[in-house]
Amino acid sequence: MEAHLADMESSGGPTSSLAGTSRNTHVEDDDVVFIESVQPPICAPAIPNERNFVFASSKHENPPGTDSTISPSWRDLTSQKGNLCETIVIDDEGDTDTNGGEEKNPTDFIEWGPNGNKSSTKNVDFPIASLSRSKTKTAVGPFNPGRIDVTDAFQNGRFAVHHNPDSWISQSASFPRNQKQQGVDSLSPVASLPKQIFQPSNQQPTKPVKVTCANCKKPLQKGQTAYQRKGSAHLFCSTTCLSSFSHKRTRKTRNVMCKKDSPVRTTTIVPPVESSKSLQGFYNASLSPYENCQSLRKEVFTKSRCIICNKLGEVRHEISVNSITHKLCSNNCFNEYRLTNGLIMNCCEQCSKYMPKSTGHSILITGQQKRFCCQNCADEYKEIMEAKSKLLLLQNRKRNAIREENEKRLRESSGTLSGNTGDIPEKKEKSSEIIKVAADCSLDTSSEEQNVNLPCSVAVISDTFKEQLGDKNSEELDMSILPSLDPGSWPRILNMKQREFLVKNNPPQIRNFNFPKDSAGKKFSETYYTRILPNGEKGTRPWLLYSASKDSVFCLYCRLFGEGKNQLRNENGCKDWHHLSHLLSKHDESEMHINNSVKYSKLKSDLENKTNEATEGGEDCVQLLYT
């Protein structure tokens, strides 16, 4: 290799050589350093030539801040006349040719002589198989602005020059990437490096999302009934958690009146010097009418009327049936609504724990089927019911005592009145009428007449009054109060006593009857008494009544409490047998029918409570039926 370089030196006159690597790579670097020669020390021979060296930096240069000395090995630099400019391009990104497992870097040296000389090209191959230099294709190393040692470049696999201690080369200037110096041709633009995309090798499997109750934080099982308040994203496992979680958020409304346009009328309050009130109290006292109006609106929007008790208060439960929302104020109203409409919940009556249909204990309590998850919940529920019944008994006793005192005072006043009247029969009849009216105004006259010993005069007057008016009143009451059980014979408008009579007697459904056919051959069938629920189960229609006198059907709830011109509500009934199935299914889901059913169940429960109070008035113990 030294002989080859010697031939290059003796190839004629002062030359300027360009050393470059010929390769076909996708990555080039355009970081350029311009280096010019400086005067050596006095003891060294002067260098008349001023050279500019251009190095194409590679990614394996020394880090910034390290200085190295470059000494040229050409002997004829001192014999050169004039100032010649030499450009040297060094690049270590050459392609490697593989030949028998050995890598080589072909390097071309191109020499230029003075004007008129032809350029000659010599190919020099340097084997670099034994070198430990590593090449990286994914990134470009930092640019070295310091001095470069040519011998280090040869050791890295490029070229070798003889070190000449008499030559001194220093750095003159450095330029960043993709920048061109005036008067010097820069290298070709560098192709952009391909970006390496890093992808995770192993993606973590997605975990199944657990849905929990917002109140008790218990996980909801698959298939479990979840409760959700309208307008809220929280889910609950039971109605107890739903009602105890939080209050309903305030309704957002649009401001109708702008605060700037509204007249601000404030009352100026000057607190006395000795006042101990805070400034906040005086500030609240001087609110504008607009702010007062806004506070009243918020209070109105947070309250609504319950469909069961008809009270205006906070809504704790909302039930949506066919886009109709029914609002309930408490758990008691919700339970009453559920029992009235036959809603079945798969949860324990005591702890509200979810239970599948095939599990749990079913117990009949006060004529109603209750479900419990375990025997402990059933015992606790029994204790609660017994405590409530004892409380009701005490309240009944208190009311009875008050009623007895009022009747005692009435008897004393009537006794004095009968003593003063003497033998006048007309006054006796008037006094007996007064006593009768007072007895009718009492809550329960039948039970009290057996326990109370009336005076002789009052008893005689009442007996004579009953004997005289007994027959006439009984006939009139039977005609006006007691309608027949056939809904076709009921009057158009029913009074309260007639409604109570029909609710107590519960008109039966006609079965095993030869229903007549109409002109089209259609007739009523007993299958209309049942219906198919959305879950596939069969449900009953206890409100559907057939009238044999008019050959039509009626709705018991809507006939007693309904209003309007519905066919199932009016006095003629419905006899459209061809479309009856569609009419009944539509009537089941109507808002009017649901409201009337609630009224019917409420009246029936009130009547049952009155009868229970009358029967349990003389008993000291509490009796509950458990099977």
Curated annotation (Swiss-Prot):
Compartment(s) where it occurs, according to its Swiss-Prot or TrEMBL record: Nucleus
Keywords: Isopeptide bond, Metal-binding, Nucleus, Repeat, Transcription, Transcription regulation, Ubl conjugation, Zinc, Zinc-finger
Region (Disordered): 1-23, 91-123, 405-429
Cellular component, GO, one term: nucleus
Composition bias type Polar residues, residue spans: 12-23
Cross-link for Glycyl lysine isopeptide (Lys-Gly) (interchain with G-Cter in SUMO2), residue positions: K59, K137, K195, K408, K427, K517
GO molecular function: zinc ion binding
Chain ranges of zinc fingers (MYM-type): 234-268, 280-319, 326-354, 370-396
One biological process term in Gene Ontology: negative regulation of transcription by RNA polymerase II
Function: Functions as a transcriptional regulator.
Quaternary structure and interacting proteins, as annotated: Interacts (via N-terminal 120 amino acid region) with ETV5 (via C-terminal).
Protein name: Zinc finger MYM-type protein 5
Organism whose genome encodes this protein: Mus musculus
